[in-house]
């Protein structure tokens, strides 16, 4: 039993928030995000609030949404909120506000103000304990930061299971990695749910931020993927069930997320989760559709791309391609959906989504109102986003829709036209046609129905293959009749064709024959019948070529493989069967060789059989010379006769040695025959065992083939034969070019139309024929380039553009394979064409060719030599010498006479320089001479025509730069450096405005300074002048690299040159330095430090840093950007800015010494500038020059900048490091240098005493210099300086000390001791010095020391306080020392507390005297006034018990006088009075007020108000017991204040208070009285109340009517506040005043100005009393009867519009509240009876007409009362309606319009309440 009870008690104790558990409270209070536990534990809530509120205010400036929290959790009241004292409901309301703030601040937690603000929630509201989950989730996105670690450290130990993952990291104080968080989200449902709910809550509040949503999206995506992976199971049903559970948990999150469209990152996160669900689980089609619709419905412009990706992924998971309707509509509404899908298709599969779009577009074609959807389809197919299979599916969808359209209705014409165009696109597109044909072939579509529905024709075979068209076109007819028979019948009657079928390109009978042959090709019987046709002349085959030429043309032509193979088969069969004929069939050889190169193996096999047959014939007939088709093969014309035939024996050798041995390989390799011909004609046999063909035979064979290629009219076999021959450059002593040149010339002569017709008929590409024709020219031909160019030059308009393009392509192709001398000739020819015929079509081709081939150096040199010549020729066309004018530079200002000629010259130069630039000039160093000559010519020409010529200069300089940069890589220059013209390059920098030219020239100068410095440096200085005005302004990366390179390479060489000449380097480079400093303002800000840093490094820090600093200071003075740069230059410890003067062992000594030396040289420069004859400053700063500044102004600027550097550079840190080292040598050197610098500053100060501005600037330097010292060193230095006789110096150093102490002085023990040791020195100055200003400075220092260090040893400060309070300080006549002394005493009081008592008597007496002096009329001193009150405030706070009553009386009297003074500020006085009220004993304070109230009234309203505020604050801040003890004096004060109205009215015109002032004071005293009442009990207060009542009602003689009315008015105003504030608690007090109220109601009137205020107070008092009655006080008949009649009788006062308005506004609401309080039917009836008397005339309370209802204003007021009662009481009041109806009827006919209008309103009001009309009741 005991153990159980103990366990329960321990649990209760664990959860207890008992206020007496001080240890737990301290622990809780010390938990903070930003303070250490020890620090936090010592802070009170005022301090914490002040710190945190500052952060909150900064947040409000960032986001106005934070402002609303200023009235709640960041209000002043929040400092006293204690959650342990709040009820559960109040805590719940508080939670809502706190969590709203946390949600909003979450996005800014990495900002310091946000952390401060949140710390208030932790310190005051303990959100980490009461709102743990929300707090953790707010910080969780920052789990890797130290901030999250701080939170972990203050979280409760008993974290819920939701956050169990954080427990080990909390214990170890480690940041959690990402993996455990993901694992927790995967396995811990509560954690994932909490994160999801938090994210949705924050997003709904529009408080989302990137950190949160990025964190959430990553966590939930990985968690869902992990859950799905871990739920996989071997049993499908189990896995399915687990997946469904996961999906059911996730879908609500997605649903809520998709609903928040405006939170784009949240929506994208939902897309990611959707993708994971789709890819890792088998979602049902219905669920996928739902997800897709949700995705499509959620996207905005920001999330559209991600939404489409998600939709594409989801679509890929669907088994069907159809998209849900809503998703489809959303997609089709997008702009340019195809482009959007194209953009994402490179990373994601979009095929299913596109198929879904296609399906949606062709769905319900008959219902389409427009063609918008169908117009999308062509773009879908044209973009080729779909693969071949998907494209086929999409085509099938279109065809299916078109074929079934007639079943669902009728398509519109627009729809029909769109679909027809789309199908034609399928037919005609190169990409789509094969897929379409395959789709048609593999499907069962009703083609006829599609054609009928679309009114178009579907071509089901490729258009170029006419024979297949015949076969396909007649496919259906074959079944019905024999198409071959009908075709054959038309040919049977044809006679033998007159010539060979190879004689012409177009033979009509051939076209008919080939169609018939195609029909017969599948049957041997039909083929035999066809072969026997007379038109073919089979029987005459040995004499005429018709039979074989027909089949040769077929197998060589563009026909189907089957048809061609059958033709070859017939030829082979014929040759085999007629082997006995003594014929030489070499004429067929070229065609069969081409067939051996055919891509089809079947063709190659049949061709091999035919060749074998011919070979068999040759074996049998070796000596015959009867060549078949010798003169007829290509017709009877010269074409046949021009063929170079082989002797039969030679032909037999060719077959036996070259063709027949390789037939087997040729069958399997289409490229083998070309290799065979190539090796054969070159003299190498393919078969090792076969003997080679001899050279004459090779020549004969080659010319035989070439002649056939030339004479053959048909281009299909001609092109094939050329393809074989163009692989052979030479054969048997001749070249391909020589043999086939006639063919090239003939081809050149054809017109474009002829070529087009030929290629169209022969079905060969024009480009391929052109290419093969020009390939005839071989690079091994000596004049190959000349020959090619001769075909296009001279240019003829008849030349085809395709031929010209092919010629130039061939030239480009063989250029590298011809000799350099031929290249030179060709280049010259091309150059002449390129620049000679500006209107020729060859120009661009020539130019492009020259740009694209590799030109040899000799060509480039020759081209460059043309530029000076061209410019010289150009000058020759200038004006006559007599009309020339010379410019200032004695150059001819030439005007160009012929603009066209000038344009040609410019074009020529541009082209040449572009060629050089693109020809890798670095590989041609020999071009340097020509380029410099070109540069000279350009520069000369530029100066004459006043043109920049920037592009040409840029090209020239760029080429030179490339050559120079390559030369820099080698030990010796690769070109003759004597050709260098550095002056021209520098002139380019100086005179051009083009950034490109400037940069190139600068880089060139940099490069030249490396390889030939002696030729460059004498010209280099203008570069820096120019850089300062131009290049340094650039901000692009290239310009920056140019500047860097120029500085790196030119400056060191320049410095070395100056040193070699033994010249002063600083003076010698002054122009350079001036250029850079002048350019400062134009240099991009982020480049400045780096640029100047590099410059100083290259120049040498030791010699140049001071000069650069001085020149910057001289030019820009205190410009902020310049100061930042200067600080950076001297503070960068890691940079070479701080190079050593001489090596020292200590790590920071060398850099520090350099810095001090820089400052020393800088001060030397200042001194030099002030000399009568300046030296170095004249060179660097322009002192003494004509355009130089005044020396004093220069010195001021230099000194001010130096002071800034001392304050803001790293000098102080380096000084401390140096003195902390153990290297005495370093310390000694630094001390010596510092002393020299200090001596310099002091010397300058002594020398410039007559120069005020320079002296001030020097003082600033001195102060800043002292600022670099530690406080101890500083004081040591000051003690020495105080021994100097100069009071000005002594004042200066003390002011510096005060400034140092005012900032953040050192707090270490040594510093504190040293400062306190210095205090006597200051005290001695105050006591003995006659210099008031020096005293003032000393007192200021004492003030700082007391404030900062006084608590360390208060006893040492007391003596200083006594001196300050003495005659030596605040007893002086000078106001400055008085003010400073009083302020110092105030600070000492704050520090010393009761230790201040020894100095107190003198301090108080003198300060009161000083206050009185400061208030003397005409001698007001507001500063002295405020200082004195600040002293009183400090005394009240720290030693209030030492302030006696008389002193308080004096302070109050003087404060009254101050309040009435116009020139005195109020803040200090009011603060002192507040401190008196808070801290001084309440009895003493109230006693002083009571004694001096009359003086406050005499002083005026302001003094009276402030005095009342003292009383109010004293009651508020002191405990209840103090109020009870002092009730007597408090009552006395209140009675005096309550009597103020009477007193002022009694004075009449002599009154000092306006009525507004009186009312304001009465409001204040009412508030004070209420505060007093709160601290009293009823037994204490009730006697006071009765006393107050008696005082108000009977306290004056009866004859003093005005006084009685004044007191009653004040009393009733108090009662209004009394009943209104304390409400039902004091309702019973009304019994005391009923009789008085009734009396007042009988005699006060709103129309009487004397009683109006009293009447108003009475009405409002009664209203407050009635309103808060909860004890049925006014239901009592005795109370009700007593008050009702006098109150309702007040309606009679409404006799005119003004009084009626007042009665309606005041009396009517009071009557209404009385009726509500009466709350019974009987009481209501009595009230109504009284009220209705005023609805009729002659019913006034006095019986006369004026007082009754006779006056319409009275009736109107009564009606308003009835309306108000009806509105407030409703049906309860309308129970009296029967009594009212007669009155209503009469009033509806009242003679007064206003009365009649209001009664009708009342009737409507009644009807609305009752829900029925009153018409029947009123009739």
Swiss-Prot record:
Primary subcellular site in the record, as a coarse category: nucleus
Where does this protein have coiled-coil stretches? none
Alphabetically, which GO biological process terms does the record hold?
maturation of SSU-rRNA from tricistronic rRNA transcript (SSU-rRNA, 5.8S rRNA, LSU-rRNA); positive regulation of transcription by RNA polymerase I
Give the subcellular location. Nucleus, Nucleolus; Membrane
Where are the disulfide bridges? none
Gene symbol here is: utp10
Mark the transmembrane ranges: 945-965, 1001-1021
Give the family, as the similarity comment puts it. Answer: Belongs to the HEATR1/UTP10 family.
How is this protein situated with respect to the membrane?
Multi-pass membrane protein
Q: What is this protein called?
A: U3 small nucleolar RNA-associated protein 10
In terms of SUPFAM superfamilies, this protein maps to:
ARM repeat
Described by its record, this protein's role is as follows:
Involved in nucleolar processing of pre-18S ribosomal RNA. Involved in ribosome biosynthesis.
Keyword entries, A-Z: Membrane, Nucleus, Repeat, Ribonucleoprotein, Ribosome biogenesis, rRNA processing, Transmembrane, Transmembrane helix
Source organism of this protein record: Aspergillus clavatus (strain ATCC 1007 / CBS 513.65 / DSM 816 / NCTC 3887 / NRRL 1 / QM 1276 / 107)
This protein's assembly is summarised as:
Component of the ribosomal small subunit (SSU) processome.
One of this protein's Pfam families, by short name?
HEAT_HEATR1
List the SMART domains hit by this protein, alphabetically: BP28CT
